């Protein structure tokens, strides 16, 4: 991230104010303030990640993934023989914090800030699947979109989706 000295000074002052306004996160803000003031290039890349963007198409895909899991769980709940499919298989895991942090951040934003999909269980890891999931979800979406009744899936259709 390239910043002029004036921009760095302004951002440093913002972090200083945030330290006072949000004591619970003061240590984090002091760290970021030091990085900005001293211009540590490697650590400044963290700011690129924090100020990155997700394209509208990506956001819509993530919502579609979450909606698919909602449909999977509703359909599973309506099955007469739920024992044939483990409930954990139709539970949304989230994304990998190490390699899919922006996707994970968007999921957390949708659930915790926007109040959508609040019935999803964040588990002890807060939707951190701890393994890359994007490609798996893409395969699952392809199968789900081909189903004629996406919210009234049969056991066979559920299995096809989760095994994609």
UniProtKB/Swiss-Prot annotation:
GO terms for molecular function: identical protein binding. InterPro entries: UPF0304_YfbU (IPR005587), YfbU_alpha-helical_sf (IPR023146), YfbU_helix-hairpin_sf (IPR023145). Induction: Only a leaderless mRNA has been detected in vivo, the first nucleotide is the beginning of the start codon. One of its GO terms (biological process) is DNA damage response. Pfam families: YfbU. One of its GO terms (cellular component) is cytosol. Belongs to the UPF0304 family. This is UPF0304 protein YfbU. The lineage of its organism: Bacteria, Pseudomonadati, Pseudomonadota, Gammaproteobacteria, Enterobacterales.
């Amino acid at each position: 991230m390239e910043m002029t000295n004036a921009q760095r000074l302004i951002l440093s002052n913002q972090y200083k104010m945030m330290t006072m306004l949000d004591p619970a996160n003061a240590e984090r803000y002091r760290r970021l303030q030091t990085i900005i003031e001293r211009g540590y290039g490697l650590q400044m890349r963290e700011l690129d990640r924090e100020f990155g963007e997700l394209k509208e198409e990506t956001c819509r895909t993530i919502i579609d993934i979450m909606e698919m899991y909602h449909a999977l769980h509703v359909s599973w709940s309506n099955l007469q023989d739920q024992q044939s499919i483990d409930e954990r298989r139709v539970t949304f895991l989230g994304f990998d914090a190490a390699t899919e942090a922006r996707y994970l951040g968007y999921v957390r934003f949708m659930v915790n800030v926007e109040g959508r999909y609040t019935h999803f269980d964040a588990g002890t890891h807060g939707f951190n699947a701890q393994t890359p999931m994007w490609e798996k979800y893409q395969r699952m979406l392809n199968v789900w979109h081909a189903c004629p009744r996406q919210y009234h899936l049969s056991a066979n259709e559920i299995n096809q989706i989760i095994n994609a």
